[in-house]
Amino acid sequence: HPQDSVGYTNPSAQPYQYLNLYQTFRTRATVTSFRYTGYFQREYVWQRDSVEYTFNGGVRFNYWTLNNQLLISPRAMVSMLPNWKRNVMFRFASGVYYQPPFYKEFRDFNGNTNLNIKAQRSIHFILGGDYEFEAWGRPFKFIGELYYKYMDNVIPYEVDNVRIRYYGTNNAVAYATGIDLKVNGEFVEGTESWISVSVMQTKENLLDDAYYIYLNNEGDTIIPGYTVNNVPTDSIQVTPGWIPRPTDQRVNVGLYFSDYFPNNPNLKMHLTLFFGTGLPFGPPNNHERYKATLRMPPYRRVDIGFSYLLKDAKKEMKRKNVFGHFKNIWLQAQIFNLLQINNTISYLWVEDFTGRQYAVPNYLTSRQLNVKMTFEF
């Protein structure tokens, strides 16, 4: 039987039963358009009271003949470098950004093209800073940023397995806010390592997603496939409001650590760790974004790699030697997903004869070995 049913559709056991497609579309569209773009940018640097200031500003223009929309996007960044004993820099950036839609974004679920669609707009506010310091006699750098982004004319989309389907209309507003922190430096002398932590929240509000809950004469909510009495006698209108966007991954942690063998610095080890909280998901093919509030399991992954410098640019070789034409030659071996963790990428929804659906996870690649050689001229 097909993988999206639990046996009630089985052509081999029911040879005279027709298998009708659940949903079919046949469309044709021809789109011809032209884009005209341009930008202007200027930077100023000046000093006052032993503080160095930098201003970088510009504006970008975009005109698209498809919807006859002229977009003007100003943006600016100001940084301040005080004359302190510690090397610290502060910066603030803001701007208006537009994203004209691609073909898939102005094509709705039924294959119709919306030629009146507008570009999505985002207003950014970013406050950040850099701090360079020394620890254990070695250089390090700390980078931190706080940001808030407000978006309107948003084109919502839903994820069906690994397929992205857009609504084809500007019917939502959204926001994203969070903090990014990163430290990189020589945790081991002569090698670069880093650790990063990010916390983010992004939500959207569809302007036309109100729906009704239907009640039977016993006052119970009618749920097809679950309730016995499915005759509605009353209804309640529900406005979902703000819901998580498909990219709402609350916490992300990454670590990259490199080291080398004390007696052989040409032989190095690289260790990478990733952790991310679960992404939202919901039932498929219902075009009801407010139901996509379930969460996948967290993403966890550990990679390890070893690299050996076979040929060093510092060592001279005879030109007649075939390897003498290369500066460096590296041999690398990597093991991806070392702990063989099953990370969920999407869900396959299986339906039974009552209409109930069950989410079966699809997993990313398991443990994998990769070997490569790198030649540098």
Task: Tell me the role of every PLM-derived stretch.
Residues 1, 57-61, 78, 92-96, ...:
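Transmembrane beta-barrel strands of outer-membrane/channel proteins
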Residues 30-36, 70-72, 121-125, 173-177, ...:
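Residues that define the transmembrane beta-barrel architecture of outer-membrane proteins
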Residues 46-53, 82-88, 134-140, 189-190, ...:
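Short loop/turn motifs that connect adjacent beta-strands in outer-membrane beta-barrel proteins
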Residues 48-49, 148-150, 170-283:
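Gram-negative outer-membrane beta-barrel transporters
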Residues 274-285, 308-377:
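C-terminal beta-signal and adjacent terminal beta-strands/loops
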